[in-house]
Design a protein with these regions (language model features):
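Beta-strand-rich binding/interaction modules
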Residues: 52-53, 63-141
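Amphipathic alpha-helical substructures
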Residues: 1-83
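Generic helix N-cap/helix-start motif at coil->alpha-helix transitions
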Residues: 35, 164-173
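Short acidic/polar inter-strand loop motif in beta-rich domains
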Residues: 141-152
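Residue-level recognition of alpha-helix boundary/capping or hinge positions
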Residues: 1-5, 119-121, 144
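Structural detector for internal amphipathic alpha-helices that build alpha-solenoid repeat scaffolds
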Residues: 169-183
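Ankyrin-repeat helical core positions
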Residues: 162-163, 179
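Amphipathic alpha-helical scaffolding segments comprising HEAT/armadillo-like alpha-solenoid repeats
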Residues: 151-162, 184-185
């Protein structure tokens, strides 16, 4: 299951076209002999023409996983949603900070706004310009992140997300979050 999640994270990072272009290269280059993680990494790096050492260092060879907490603040005057993302897992020489992409999805009265961010620090704030006040917010749209996420959702927001989120992973996550705080659906 861990290798599946690693591939899932890599697909999120590279995108479908590069990820799926790398798979045949890996299979053809390594046909009929044992393979290792560096063989997989080399095939994917050759396909995307990028250095993925940092990715494999944290997801394949590293210890642990990211634990993320976020807090939001709506600045009505600037029409900007500020999202502070904090990595809460233990960080030391053996457990470094993680680096990972995340999609923020915000629904307003008239639009759906998606913003791609790259989380790489212990705590950082991202500004998302919006046409109007946010009605719904989703951190990690699609549920790609291999880690845990906690946020400043109210019970009402979680209940709305559980019933009406745009994807099943969001609805499932909201139900689990409601269960964790003792809400019964």
């Amino acid at each position: 299951a861990l290798l599946e999640r690693l591939a899932h994270q890599l697909r999120r990072l590279l995108g479908d076209s590069l990820f799926w272009a790398g798979m045949p290269r890996f299979l053809v280059d390594n046909a009929y002999h044992p393979v290792t993680t560096p063989d997989y990494a080399a095939a994917m790096e050759q396909t995307c023409h990028c250095d993925l050492d940092w990715f494999f260092d944290q997801w394949a060879y590293g210890i642990g996983y990211p634990r993320v907490a976020f807090a939001r603040h709506w600045d009505a005057a600037a029409k900007t949603l500020h999202v502070t993302v904090t990595q809460t897992q233990p960080v030391d020489s053996v457990h470094p900070l993680f680096r990972f992409p995340v999609t923020l999805r915000v629904i307003t009265r008239d639009s759906v706004v998606r913003r791609e961010i790259m989380v790489s620090r212990a705590s950082e704030t991202f500004a998302v310009a919006l046409p109007a006040e946010p009605l719904s917010f989703r951190f990690d749209e699609g549920g790609w992140l291999l880690g845990t996420v906690a946020g400043d959702y109210s019970e009402a927001e979680l209940a709305t997300m559980a019933a009406h989120d745009l994807d099943v992973r969001g609805r499932d996550w909201a139900v689990l979050a409601l269960t964790a705080i003792g809400m019964v659906l």
